[in-house]
């Protein structure tokens, strides 16, 4: 594994750990100002503006969600939901070191639990990453669920 592949892999693993630990403000800081977080409904969906999505949020909406999750008066999250990511080894799909642009895809199982309810999701996370200075940042995080076209309850946290 070369240095950049190792760095990209560690970034993906660190991001999942932040989510599992509930470090949402720190996680939000990984995103560029023009970032998007997208969970399409259908496999192969190419345009979030022309099709329905389970979630399509810019950084402002992500920030509002993070603030809500951090608030003491978020009664729908008392007690708080918890999550766990089980990741397959991330695969680098495209790498342009000169431009500082990378695409990494990771298969995952994700468990979200609150009280006595546990929900399992499975799918693939595709990260479009860019370098800003010496930092990697997320420009787009796309989550393709195996059953994205199924009926879902609330997805409380972030995959």
Q: Where in this protein do the model-derived segments appear?
A:
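Short, histidine-centered active-site or binding-site loop motifs used for metal coordination
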Residues: 12, 41, 108
């Amino acid at each position: 594994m070369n240095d950049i592949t190792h760095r990209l892999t560690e970034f993906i693993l660190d991001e999942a750990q932040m989510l599992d630990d509930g470090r949402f403000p720190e996680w939000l800081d990984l995103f560029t100002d023009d970032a998007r977080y997208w969970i399409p409904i259908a496999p192969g969906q190419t345009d979030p503006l022309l099709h329905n999505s389970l979630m399509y949020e810019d950084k402002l909406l992500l920030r509002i969600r993070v603030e809500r999750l951090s608030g003491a008066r978020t009664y729908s999250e008392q007690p708080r939901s918890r999550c766990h990511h089980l990741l397959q080894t991330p695969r680098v799909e495209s790498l342009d070191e000169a431009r500082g642009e990378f695409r990494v895809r990771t298969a995952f199982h994700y468990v979200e639990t609150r009280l006595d309810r546990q929900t399992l999701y499975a799918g693939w996370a595709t990260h479009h990453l860019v370098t800003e200075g010496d930092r990697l940042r997320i420009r787009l995080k796309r989550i393709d669920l195996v059953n994205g076209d199924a009926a879902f309850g609330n997805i409380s946290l972030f995959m």
